[in-house]
């Protein structure tokens, strides 16, 4: 716990907006220490988090009471359905993480048989956000968590209704990343039922090149923000809020139509 507090202080001293992720079981125990360290945003995260916690071994977290008494904004997740998201929003959460098992390193969908396709989950949670806005006048941010490796994936998440995205594997491809091209992300570690694995992502460039470019490859894994801006411009939108209103469709052939040569040669969209 002291090490967590020390790292928060180091990032704050560097002028970085700092967040910390805790599980529901450890939230109350860690709360005072991390808030005293100057934390800007608290993330309460599990595979699936509900507004009502049940525990036979410890005092369950009263999420609504905790959020209302906490001094900084709280983001909660994951969730993947309209009703679960609406319940989380009604606790006072500033943002909701969307995604159960879409990440590259996560095996929850195979181990537990639980998950919702990410585009559907984002759209459903965005619908809950609009209902909550109509009921309360409070806008809750929808954050797509996992399943995005390319700029086009981020663009599609925004058009489905996300306000922001949380990515893992693209950042592990940075030269600066400590694992040097490997990713073991936020997937659940468990001594008897692990639900995550280590995957190779390869080193592709600097963190700046991955996020802001310039790209020296044409597969969409570099210059993610440049791809998002170009996607918005191509569709005729200037802001993310406008882009959320773009028309979307289910198009399985989008990645393969007219790309036979790329696939046969293993280049571009064919690898």
Model region roles, listed by residue range:
Residues 1-136, 141, 171, 259:
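Active-site entrance/lid segments in N-terminal catalytic domains of soluble metabolic enzymes
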Residues 3, 71, 113-144, 149-271:
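Alpha/beta catalytic cores of nucleotide-metabolism and tRNA/nucleoside-modifying enzymes
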């Amino acid at each position: 716990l002291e090490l967590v507090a020390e790292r928060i202080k180091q990032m704050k001293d560097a002028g970085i907006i700092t967040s910390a992720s805790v599980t529901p079981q450890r939230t109350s125990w860690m709360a005072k220490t991390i808030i005293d360290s100057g934390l800007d945003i608290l993330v309460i995260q599990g595979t699936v988090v509900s507004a009502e916690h049940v525990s036979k071994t410890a005092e369950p977290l009263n999420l609504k009471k905790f959020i209302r008494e906490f001094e900084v904004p709280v983001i909660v997740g994951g969730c993947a359905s309209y009703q679960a998201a609406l319940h989380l929003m009604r606790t006072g959460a500033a943002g909701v993480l969307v995604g159960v098992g879409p990440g590259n390193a996560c095996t929850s969908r195979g181990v537990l048989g639980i998950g919702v396709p990410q585009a559907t989950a984002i759209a459903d949670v965005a619908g809950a956000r609009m209902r909550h806005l109509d009921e309360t006048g409070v806008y809750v941010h929808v954050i797509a968590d996992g399943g995005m490796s390319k700029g086009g994936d981020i663009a599609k998440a925004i058009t489905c209704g996300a306000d922001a995205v949380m990515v893992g594997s693209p950042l592990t491809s940075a030269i600066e990343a400590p694992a040097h091209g490997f990713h073991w992300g936020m997937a659940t570690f468990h001594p008897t039922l692990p639900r995550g694995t280590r995957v190779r992502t390869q080193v592709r460039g600097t963190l700046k090149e991955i996020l802001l470019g310039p790209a020296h490859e044409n597969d969409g894994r570099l210059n993610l923000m440049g791809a998002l801006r170009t996607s918005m411009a191509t569709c005729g939108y200037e802001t993310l809020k406008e882009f959320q209103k773009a028309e979307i469709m289910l198009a399985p052939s989008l990645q393969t139509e007219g790309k036979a040569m790329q696939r046969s040669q293993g280049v571009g969209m064919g690898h």
